[in-house]
Amino acid sequence: MVELKEPLATLWRGKDAFAEVKKLNGEVFRELETRRTLRFELSGKSYFLKWHKGTTLKEIIKNLLSLRMPVLGADREWHAIHRLSDVGVDTMKGIGFGEKGLNPLTRASFIITEDLTPTISLEDYCADWAVNPPDIRVKRMLIARVATMVRKMHTAGINHRDCYICHFLLHLPFTGREDELKISVIDLHRAQIRAKVPRRWRDKDLIGLYFSSMNIGLTQRDIWRFMKVYFGMPLRKILSLEQNLLNMASVKAERIKERTQRKGL
């Protein structure tokens, strides 16, 4: 299966898309055993290629033992991008997708997306907030926007699995005006898509966001503000219905921190 949009639909018409993908050269961002991420130029524009080369038996067994479906190709990200676009969540724009092969160990697939530039990750944008607090209006605006995006994502049946502020890109220029605010969520290759997001996967995304925001100087009031927008209900009701989430957020965020430090990430 191959699906191409412009300009690839014209440039690669009548050609083997997989052969064309293999010819692409550029800046390698990540090189793993089963996945390669490359930024390249085409007709004066910048794009990203993610090339998946099946998976390993070890990875399949590890995921199945954890009751998770392993990532077998680029299809998850392609479908997640389109589902998010349908529900009004800004994300990457996919212009090319292809997959071939039935054996999960050898299946090949690719996804090509437009390079979102100029942008800055929220991790970098907020990096000095703890020592150089932002305009309170801007901070509240960003908190509300991310909360709305994550709520829409979960309502659409998608959980990210790597839901950290580094995967939310703020489009530039941004001078603090709400009418110019645009944030796109990226890196959806591990996303899961269902009719409804199970509570435990919803909580994993929320705890991931909390963990990745721990060092940017957010106050307890900022966290409550996020939760009120995300859950769409008064704080008193959230505290009653979501006590389990609140109890385990700090504990699990600390575990993520320890695991991240152990892996040297």
From Swiss-Prot:
The processes (GO biological process) annotated in the record are: carbohydrate phosphorylation; lipopolysaccharide core region biosynthetic process
Cofactor(s) recorded in Swiss-Prot or TrEMBL? Mg(2+)
Q: Enzyme group, top EC level?
A: transferase
- Protein keywords: ATP-binding, Kinase, Lipopolysaccharide biosynthesis, Magnesium, Nucleotide-binding, Transferase
Q: Has UniProt tagged this entry with the keyword Calcium?
A: no
Q: Give the Enzyme Commission number.
A: 2.7.1.235
Which reaction is the catalytic activity of this chain? an L-alpha-D-Hep-(1->3)-L-alpha-D-Hep-(1->5)-[alpha-Kdo-(2->4)]-alpha-Kdo-(2->6)-lipid A + ATP = an L-alpha-D-Hep-(1->3)-4-O-phospho-L-alpha-D-Hep-(1->5)-[alpha-Kdo-(2->4)]-alpha-Kdo-(2->6)-lipid A + ADP + H(+); L-alpha-D-Hep-(1->3)-L-alpha-D-Hep-(1->5)-[alpha-Kdo-(2->4)]-alpha-Kdo-(2->6)-lipid A (E. coli) + ATP = L-alpha-D-Hep-(1->3)-4-O-phospho-L-alpha-D-Hep-(1->5)-[alpha-Kdo-(2->4)]-alpha-Kdo-(2->6)-lipid A (E. coli) + ADP + H(+)
Q: Which InterPro entries match?
A: Kinase-like_dom_sf, Lsacc_core_hep_kinase_RfaP
Which GO molecular function, any one, fits this protein according to its record? ATP binding
> Which pathway?
Bacterial outer membrane biogenesis; LPS core biosynthesis
Active site annotation, chain numbering: 162
Name the family the entry cites: Belongs to the protein kinase superfamily. KdkA/RfaP family.
Q: What does this protein do?
A: Kinase involved in the biosynthesis of the core oligosaccharide region of lipopolysaccharide (LPS). Catalyzes the phosphorylation of heptose I (HepI), the first heptose added to the Kdo2-lipid A module.
Q: Which NCBIfam families match?
A: PRK15123.1
What this protein is called in its record is Lipopolysaccharide core heptose(I) kinase WaaP
Q: Gene that codes for this?
A: waaP
